Amino acid sequence: MLLLLPLALGAAPKKAPKSQIKVALYNVTASQTRAKDVSEGKAPVQRLWSNSVEAVAEQIVTKDCDVVGLVDICDSIAGRQGNAGLPEALKAKGADYSWLILSNTRPSLPLEGAYNKTQAIIWKTDRYDCIDWSINWLGGFFDKNRLPKGVKGDATKSVTWAKFREKATGKEFYFMVASTNGQSNESLSKRNCENLIKIADEIVVTDDKPSIIMGSFNMQESAPAYKEYLSMSRWFDVYSRLKEEGLLSSSELSNKNTRNNSSGEKTSSGRPDYIFVDGFDIDSYMVAREKFPSADGTSVYPSYGFPVISSLKF
């Protein structure tokens, strides 16, 4: 009887181990912005995209993230992709990332059409399959050439999103990266936030998968628009949650800046870059502030933005 007891009671089913994923938001700064600042004497020549692309790639490879949201990857005035040389630089360093860049004019077709500082998503090819994707507008306007009178062209903000399937387990999750208008237009930024939450809800509610929303929301925690994010019933700010639970390091509490100034000489104030999650456990959060060699060997911050990184489980 004693030998049969475990069978009679039934062995407790083993829980599948949680999958680990390391994600990052990286505002890489469009090449036209860099060129303008250099031409006006606001930034050193090392800031040019052609001089920084290797450093950007080195930072991505060094941090070894599984999925990365890249903001300001395209040139809005020229209407083209602004990632010149980055895929090649990553590959040359042994990193195998797949790319998703969606045009504002043809959202169903990657890498075609005109671009308006569109976000990109890159992911480790050997770990995930991208099974769905699209781009949605946050400002309520599709064609910036037909904007209502008095509305700025940057009202055409968007969110690029993808649905991924982990190859090893079949687990699925959503990944969204966006940029909003920020402090220069608080009312429009608030509407961006409202629309982003609405869009995300409509996408995720269909199958209730874990999801990540990240972006350069260009606002401080004291901004009214930030309250829109805090009111989200589903998603929560990784930084704020860890801060509330007393799990942030003293260095991250004392220095939460996610940007540096145009000259690259010092960090800027505030935290305009965010990661929100739902359905994930948080292992860690950090802002990567290392310098890397530019084309001439000068150590520089590769971009105006620092990578914001979080290790998660689901």
Feature roles, as predicted:
Residues M1-P6:
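Bacterial N-terminal signal peptides
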Residues L9-K93, N104-L111, N116, E194, ...:
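N-terminal, active-site-proximal structural segment of metallo-dependent hydrolase catalytic domains
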Residues Q20-K42, I131-N136, W161, K171-G182:
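Active-site-proximal beta-strand elements of phosphoester/diester hydrolases
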Residues I21-V28, V56-G82, I122, A162, ...:
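Active-site beta-strand/loop signature of hydrolases that rely on acidic residues for catalysis
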Residues V28-Q32, I73-I77, T105-L109, R127-Y128, ...:
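Solvent-exposed loop/turn segments at secondary-structure junctions
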Residues G69-V71, L100-N104, I212-S216, D237-R241:
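Active-site neighborhood of phospho(di)ester-bond hydrolases with catalytic His/Asp-centered motifs
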Residues I73-E172, V287:
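Structured beta-strand-rich core segments of catalytic domains in phosphoester-bond hydrolases
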Residues D201-I212, M219-F314:
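Metal-dependent phosphoester-hydrolase catalytic domains
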